């Protein structure tokens, strides 16, 4: 890599980290290309980003972001997973690490907060923004559905009374 390529890599990673709601640092020693490709695809499907970068360049890219404190986690062969959804990157990394012992979660960050391994696992156990939105819509729709059922119930009962009265008259 020449100086211009390094500068481009740093600015690209800095832009990604500046927009990220959470960042997860993983150690990827021993991952095969196929396993790494599967992990990258899962991250992409979840709207997350997964990059293997030189630690020195990653530390430079962290400057000027809210994640400057996680630079100390960048030792050895590491990769950075980031996402605009606060739980997406953590959730995918933790799930992948459960099935593949070659991927080790080192830590991460969420805003100014530095997370250890347990913090990342706790973050991964939270529901995603889409799941929370679905639950909220369900909670908001439930009372409206009940109100509609209650409002329709007297009319239905009245119709049944008239129907029974009409059947009684006809008989």
UniProtKB/Swiss-Prot annotation:
Keywords of this entry: Ribonucleoprotein, Ribosomal protein, RNA-binding, rRNA-binding
UniProt keyword annotation of ATP-binding present: no
Keyword rRNA-binding carried by entry: yes
GO cellular component, one term: large ribosomal subunit
Domain of life of the source: Bacteria
GO terms of molecular function: large ribosomal subunit rRNA binding; structural constituent of ribosome
Gene Ontology process terms (BP): translation
Function description: Forms part of the ribosomal stalk, playing a central role in the interaction of the ribosome with GTP-bound translation factors.
Family, similarity comment: Belongs to the universal ribosomal protein uL10 family.
Subunit structure: Part of the ribosomal stalk of the 50S ribosomal subunit. The N-terminus interacts with L11 and the large rRNA to form the base of the stalk. The C-terminus forms an elongated spine to which L12 dimers bind in a sequential fashion forming a multimeric L10(L12)X complex.
The protein, known as: Large ribosomal subunit protein uL10
Natural source organism: Sphingopyxis alaskensis (strain DSM 13593 / LMG 18877 / RB2256)
């Amino acid at each position: 890599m020449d100086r211009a390529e390094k500068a481009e890599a740093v600015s690209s990673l800095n832009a990604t980290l500046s927009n990220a709601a959470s960042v997860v640092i993983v150690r990827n020693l021993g991952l095969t290309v196929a396993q790494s490709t599967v992990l990258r695809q899962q991250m992409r499907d979840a709207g997350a980003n997964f990059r293997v970068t030189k630690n020195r360049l990653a530390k430079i890219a962290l400057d000027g972001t809210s994640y400057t404190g996680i630079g100390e986690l960048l030792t050895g062969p590491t990769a950075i997973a980031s996402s605009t959804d606060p739980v997406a990157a953590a959730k995918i990394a933790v799930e992948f690490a459960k099935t593949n012992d070659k991927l080790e979660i080192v830590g991460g960050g969420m805003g100014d907060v530095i997370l250890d391994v347990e913090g990342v696992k706790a973050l991964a156990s939270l529901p995603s923004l889409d799941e929370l939105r679905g639950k909220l819509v369900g909670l908001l729709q439930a009372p409206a559905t009940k109100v509609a059922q209650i409002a329709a119930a007297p009319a239905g009962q009245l119709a049944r009374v008239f129907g029974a009265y009409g059947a009684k008259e006809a008989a």
